[in-house]
From Swiss-Prot:
SUPFAM superfamilies reported for this sequence: CinA-like, Molybdenum cofactor biosynthesis proteins
Family: Belongs to the CinA family.
UniProt xrefs under Pfam families: CinA, CinA_KH, MoCF_biosynth
Entries under Gene3D superfamilies matching the protein: 3.30.70.2860, CinA-like (3.90.950.20), MoaB/Mog-like domain (3.40.980.10)
Annotated protein name in UniProt: Putative competence-damage inducible protein
């Protein structure tokens, strides 16, 4: 079954809101073995909406709309659809009663314009809205299916799961099941080179790379009768990829870097403290995103000035004068100092030039040093990052945490 998602709303075209509905629906349809071939966005205009319906029904078996079900004159999704399909809409008493009950529940008066939300063709399958006023509907016509859903994500998701998914299951022949591997420390082009033959030759499962926020993901997708059968197809391909990429694969699914690192620290009862200059607390912030990290995270210090570095974490004045605040020597003393001062097993530090100003020929914008002290073993890493100030700072944090993860694994800590 080929599906198309048609999002309705001028606010989407203007960029006032993000179309998260399409992402959600696409993923859930994939779980049901239904492939989304196209996604479209159209404004609140009857003529253009009709053109969108005409195109969608030409190329898809299932058309799912979101938005445009409100009580105002520019909410046209249903009206144009019914006209296009040659359907006459009549007041659906049960839907009207539910809308009236909704307004009573929130203690607000219902206006006459809300009645149009309860109008549907007699052969429509009504999808009740338990979180708002606008019901949806399913219409079968000429071996095509139209499913009309509300725009607010909270209402759309509930209606999709409660009403549309049970309806669509009767068409389900296969499931599409995916597993995502998350990769750090290797660029997208290098990942593609390492697994090139897998990308080229795999048909079921397929493997597709994506790059975002300093990391690369590989999505392995299999089609089978059941999720269990799909997982069996995915398993050998996943293992081959892991064997080739090694430590670069840090997690799968929606697991974050801070979750991986936080679990390692907590499971092994290893304490940590941070000393930050250019990242200004972002490093500590990423760590404390993980629930339960308080059992091992001792302290986060922002030692931005030289005075703070000397006073709070015992960086030597001679080191700062000889090598400067942005240096491997300073990063090393920051990491070692914060570990000693806080009594932590690990100290991790950042110092650099995030920009846009402050760079020199010898020390350009984007030069960052990261220091790690693990139970007295001190190492530093020099980074050369590109982008604006915020990007340099964010990438520093990711690179620092990823390096710490690898160092812990190399020491036998998992």
């Amino acid at each position: 079954m080929k599906a198309e998602i048609l999002a309705v709303g001028t606010e989407l075209l203007l960029g006032n809101i993000v179309n998260t509905n399409a992402q959600y629906i696409s993923k859930r349809l994939a779980d049901l073995g239904i492939e989304v071939y196209n996604q479209s966005v159209v404004g609140d205009n009857a003529e253009r909406l009709r053109e969108a319906y005409e195109l969608a029904f030409k190329r898809a078996d299932l058309v799912i709309t979101t938005g445009g079900l409100g009580p105002t004159k520019d909410d046209l999704t249903k009206e144009v659809a019914f006209e296009y399909l040659g359907k006459e809409a009549k007041l659906h008493e049960e839907s009207l009663r539910r809308i009236e009950d909704y307004f009573k529940k929130i203690d607000r008066p219902m206006v006459d314009s809300n009645k149009k939300q309860a109008c549907f063709p007699e052969d429509a399958i009504i999808m009740p809205n338990n979180n708002g006023t606008a019901p949806g509907c399913i219409i079968e016509e000429n071996k095509k299916i139209l499913a009309v859903l509300p725009g607010p994500p909270r209402e759309m998701k509930a209606m999709f799961e409660e009403s549309l998914v049970p309806y669509l299951r009767k068409f389900q022949e296969n499931v599409l099941h995916s597993k995502t591997l998350r990769i750090l420390g290797v660029g997208e082009s290098r990942v593609a080179e390492i697994v090139d033959d897998i990308l080229e030759n795999s048909t079921n499962p397929t493997v597709a790379p994506y790059a975002k926020d300093s990391e690369v993901t590989l999505r392995i997708t299999a089609k089978a009768k059941t999720i269990e059968d799909a997982e069996k197809l995915i398993e050998p391909v996943e293992q081959e990829i892991r064997d080739r990429l090694g430590l670069s694969v840090y997690a799968d699914g929606e697991v974050t870097l801070e979750e991986v690192l936080g679990k390692m620290l907590i499971d092994n009862n290893i304490t940590i403290a941070t000393a930050e200059s250019c990242t200004g607390g972002l490093l500590a912030g990423r760590l404390v995103n993980y629930p339960g990290i308080s059992s091992v995270f001792k302290e986060g210090m922002i030692t931005y000035s030289n005075e703070a570095k000397m006073k709070r974490i015992k960086v030597k004045k001679d080191t700062l004068q000889k090598y400067g605040a942005v240096s491997s020597q300073t990063a090393a003393e920051m990491a070692e100092g914060v570990a000693k001062v806080t009594g932590s097993d690990i100290g991790i530090s950042t110092t650099g030039i995030a920009g846009p100003d402050g760079g020199t020929k010898e020390k350009p914008v984007g030069l960052v040093y990261v220091g790690i002290c693990i139970k007295g073993d001190v190492k530093t890493k020099e980074l050369h990052l590109v982008g604006d100030r915020q990007r340099v700072r964010q990438h520093t944090v990711i690179r620092a945490l990823e390096w710490l993860r690898r160092e812990l694994i190399r020491k036998g800590i998992k």
